[in-house]
Amino acid sequence: EFDFAIEILCGLFDEIKLTSHDFNNEKGRIKAEIREKDRRSSLDFYFNSIVWKNSEVEKIVLGYCKTIDRVSVKKINEFRQKVLSAGNCFVYATGNISDKNLDALNKKISELDISQSNPGFTNTVTVNNEFFHREKKIWIKNNYWHYIQIGFDVDCSKYPGGVYDLLYALLFNGDKALVYNYLSEDNPIIYSYDSTFEQYDNVGNINFSFEVDRNKIEDVFKTVVELLNAAKDGRFNFEANLNYEMFNWELDLDNPDNLNWNMAYYNHILKTQPIDYSDEFYGRFRVTKEQIIDAAKYIFRRCNMTVAVKGDRKKINAEAIEKILESLD
């Protein structure tokens, strides 16, 4: 099975050869997926177009139908040679893999006929003038149902990566996260919830989104502000949350898929303190409560904040929301 997996993996580096009929069929499937997902009408697309304006990550990964129409087999192969080059690829293996398996993988990779160049890509994004200087504005996209997305700009060079990850986990990510737990479990006023920490070497954005009844929009903003200010004041159980987060990371030792992502992404792609599972605190989590409080004070400010609401424009009191958000500063 491992040998078969090697063949599939190394096949990614082969020249793409398709008939015009097969290529057009594949393009048709991709365009159908784009239309079906209709991401351009989503709150997430609207939010990202504000946060990442004029940057490389403003556009959706899947692309647009008009872009797909311009793609050719020749263009794909040119891009493949540039991206799948020796200077831009690495292989990270986790799980029940023997030395014999690794030797076979190394041998197969060494035989690949790929470019030895490095395309010079960096894991950074262009920062627009609004980053860290956000306009005090509630961005509204008209809709019948009401959804809210709130995000904060992050300077990824200011604190070690473990500080941001723990702050994100503490407040927004997972069943025990303070914001999620309070809004959804302890005092349920939202219907759905999602969170993201979009992170690059220079900047990032911590954001979370949810659906809410239109009559509770102002209440939910008051609650969010109270929770963020509590984090800035240190009113949270740091030790319990640290232990819970480290317990989750320990579970990844039994999950080769998650472990592979963590080791490859944090140790080789992001410029953060590497993960060392032999270390009591995994290196990255030698974090103090004071660091979390300091980071919270720096991040959760109006100048870093983007608020996008999808709902009935006539029923949303933007001035009242803005008045509530003043308490963050």
Regions found by a protein language model. Name each.
Residues 1-121, 154-155, 185-329:
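Charge-rich, well-structured scaffold segments of protease-associated domains
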Residues 88, 117-180:
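His/Glu-based metal-binding/catalytic segments typifying zinc-dependent metallopeptidases
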